[in-house]
C-alpha cells in the first residue's frame, strides 16, 4: 500500500513565507530557505512552494528562491505560481523543482496540460484546483483565488485527469487558514471521479483533521499548524499511524 504523504506548504510573497485566512490577511512567517530546510529535516515527505502573487502580478516565479530552496532540501519539491508557458515549466525544473503546479494557466489553456505531460512526464505535472463552495456548488477560482470561473470542480478534475495531469492539489478556499478541518465533501466527490493522487489542502487544525483527509485521499498539505509550531510533521504521522494509515518515518524503526 502506498504511504500517505504529509506535505508542508510554503506560500511565498516577495521572498518571504506568509500565511493567511481564506487567501487574505497575510502575515509573515519567515525565510523560505530556512523553513524548507527545517521541514526537510523534520520528516516531511515533500514540500510545496507557491509564489502566491506571481499570477496576479503577471510575473514569473522567483527562480532564485526556488533554486536556493532546492539546494537545501532532499525531498520532492513542487513549485507553482506565475507559470505561463512550457518554457516556464522547463525553467522551474532546471532550477531544482521536481514537479510544477499549474492553476491559472491550466484553466486558461487546458491543452497545455497535455503538452506539458507529454514533454516532461505526467509525474511532474500537478494541477492545483482552488475551490469555493458557493450557491450549492464547488466552483474553480484562478489568479490566487481572486477570480471565479464557471468551472465546476468535479468536472474540471475529470478533464485535467484525462489531459494527463499526474496529481491534483485541491484547496478549499472556504476552509483555508481556519484550522477547522478539511472540506471532506469535495475530497469525497473528487475521489469518486479520478484515479490520480489527490492532495488535500485548506483547513488542517490538528492531526485528527489530517487523519480524516488521509482516509479519503493520498496526501495532506499543511501550513498554519506547522508554521505556528502547534504540532510537528512527526507528531502528525504518529497519530495517522495510530489510525492504521501507512506513513513514512525518518527513523526506519517506526516504519
Swiss-Prot record:
SUPFAM superfamilies: Ribulose-phoshate binding barrel (SSF51366). It holds the Pfam family His_biosynth. Signal peptide: none annotated. Its main location: cytoplasm. One of its GO terms (cellular component) is cytoplasm. It is found in: Cytoplasm. Pathway: Amino-acid biosynthesis; L-histidine biosynthesis; L-histidine from 5-phospho-alpha-D-ribose 1-diphosphate: step 5/9. GO terms for molecular function: imidazoleglycerol-phosphate synthase activity; lyase activity. It catalyses: 5-[(5-phospho-1-deoxy-D-ribulos-1-ylimino)methylamino]-1-(5-phospho-beta-D-ribosyl)imidazole-4-carboxamide + L-glutamine = D-erythro-1-(imidazol-4-yl)glycerol 3-phosphate + 5-amino-1-(5-phospho-beta-D-ribosyl)imidazole-4-carboxamide + L-glutamate + H(+). The active site is at residues 11, 130. Coiled coil: none annotated. It comes from the Bacteria. It is an enzyme of class 4 (lyase). GO terms for biological process: L-histidine biosynthetic process. Keywords: Amino-acid biosynthesis, Cytoplasm, Histidine biosynthesis, Lyase. Its EC number is 4.3.2.10. Heterodimer of HisH and HisF. Belongs to the HisA/HisF family. IGPS catalyzes the conversion of PRFAR and glutamine to IGP, AICAR and glutamate. The HisF subunit catalyzes the cyclization activity that produces IGP and AICAR from PRFAR using the ammonia provided by the HisH subunit. This is Imidazole glycerol phosphate synthase subunit HisF.
Amino acid at each position: 500500500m502506498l504511504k500517505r504523504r504529509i506535505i508542508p506548504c510554503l506560500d511565498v510573497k516577495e521572498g518571504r513565507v506568509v500565511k493567511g485566512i481564506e487567501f487574505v490577511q497575510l502575515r509573515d512567517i519567515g525565510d523560505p530557505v530556512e523553513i524548507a530546510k527545517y521541514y526537510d529535516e523534520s520528516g516531511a515527505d515533500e514540500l510545496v512552494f507557491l509564489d502566491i502573487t506571481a499570477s496576479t502580478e503577471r510575473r514569473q516565479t522567483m527562480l532564485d528562491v526556488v533554486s536556493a530552496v532546492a539546494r537545501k532540501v532532499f525531498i520532492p519539491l513542487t513549485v507553482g505560481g506565475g507559470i505561463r508557458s512550457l518554457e516556464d515549466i522547463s525553467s522551474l525544473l532546471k532550477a531544482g523543482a521536481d514537479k510544477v503546479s499549474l492553476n491559472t494557466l491550466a484553466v486558461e489553456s487546458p491543452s497545455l496540460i497535455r503538452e506539458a505531460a507529454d514533454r516532461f512526464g505526467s509525474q511532474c505535472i500537478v494541477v492545483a484546483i482552488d475551490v469555493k463552495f458557493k450557491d450549492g456548488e464547488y466552483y474553480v477560482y484562478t489568479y490566487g483565488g481572486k477570480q471565479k470561473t464557471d468551472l465546476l470542480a468535479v468536472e474540471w478534475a475529470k478533464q485535467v485527469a484525462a489531459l494527463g495531469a499526474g496529481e491534483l492539489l485541491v484547496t478549499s478556499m472556504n476552509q483555508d487558514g481556519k484550522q477547522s478541518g478539511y472540506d471532506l465533501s469535495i475530497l469525497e466527490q473528487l475521489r469518486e471521479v479520478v484515479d490520480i493522487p489527490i492532495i488535500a489542502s485548506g483547513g488542517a487544525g490538528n492531526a485528527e483533521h489530517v487523519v480524516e483527509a488521509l482516509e479519503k485521499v493520498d496526501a495532506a498539505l499543511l501550513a498554519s499548524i506547522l508554521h505556528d509550531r502547534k504540532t510537528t510533521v512527526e507528531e502528525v504521522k504518529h497519530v495517522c499511524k495510530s489510525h492504521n494509515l501507512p506513513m513514512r518515518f525518518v527513523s526506519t524503526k517506526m516504519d
